[in-house]
Amino acid sequence: MTFKIFATCDIGKEALDRLRQKGWDVEVYDHIEPPPKILILEKVKGGVDALVTTLRDPIDEEVFAAGKAAKLKVVAQDAVGFDNIDRAAANKHKIPFSNTADVLTDATAEFAFLIMGAVARKTWPSEQMVREQTWSTWHPYHPWLGDEVTGKTVAVIGTGRIGKSFIKKAVGFDMDVLCHDPAFEDRKFVESVRRVLDLRHREGLVPRRQTIDYVPFEEALRRADFVSLHVALTRPGESDWPTYHLMDERRLQMMKPTAYLVNTSRGPVVDENALARALLEGWIAGAALDVFEKEPLPAESPLRDDRLKLKLRMFHHFASAGRATRLSPDPDVGMAGRTVQAVIDVLENRYGSPGKVPYVVNKEAF
């Protein structure tokens, strides 16, 4: 049987070729900007069997209703997040949608650690001096001396897959770790890390015994030199511990004036107006952000204030942008591979029901 697939962006030739090799018709919207919603609706009404989407595409009630009336069998999201997909509408019309959970774990954690070091060590002014040819001489006490990461204390807020991967990197830099996760405290993981830390100390590999433990949220904020956010976005009413504006004025003021905030989770977890004020008024030393409340970052955002240049590093939702993580056709390695595998599993009915497909999110609809 021949199926028709419409991809709203090019997720990689190798991965999409897995569909083409089956004789399936694959159409790719190969432009920098996302397709207009009217085009997505046109493709759905025209009888595509699968949509390959990204966070930029509004897949709402209108799309799912059109899909139910036509032939749409699956929406395969090339991302972990699915804020753009109306889950209730998907369930109502019995159309499964998938995501790429797990495969970008290490890439995201790695990037969080890299930008934490970048903002603390104030790397940007140094590069700017070289590029602008204002590097005239060396001086040991120039005004942008940075803060070391090694041996400091980091609070990891959210100890799911990405949080755990971040912790593994932090302990390699001899950091003490304060964990907080209201959903699930993985004591077994913490104990295993603690045993490794004890062994390192006994073998003389480190001069002191590092520590790791779960602590209350506000205690973590007060004690940490770095706070790294790895939580899902939940709004009031959706969770007992909503994370929308989790880092607001009150909580930013709890942090040390020498501490740094890192966010690679979801933009609305941080109140950006409060963060801009915290940086300008010196409540905290700096911040590194890969996600924002509105993306792309609006021209009027307070985070664009030139006075924040030395204290704030900003990136364009870039954390998972590792070559293998994004493009590998292997579903155990790459987002593209996992997206394509979800399409194959649903269209070929490999599991007997969409609800049994490993990468389908809305299993409750089936």
What are these regions, as identified by a protein language model?
Residues 1-98, 222, 248, 254:
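An N-terminal-biased, well-structured beta-alpha scaffold segment characteristic
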Residues 28, 177-179:
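Short beta-strand "acidic-cap" motif of Rossmann-like dinucleotide-binding folds
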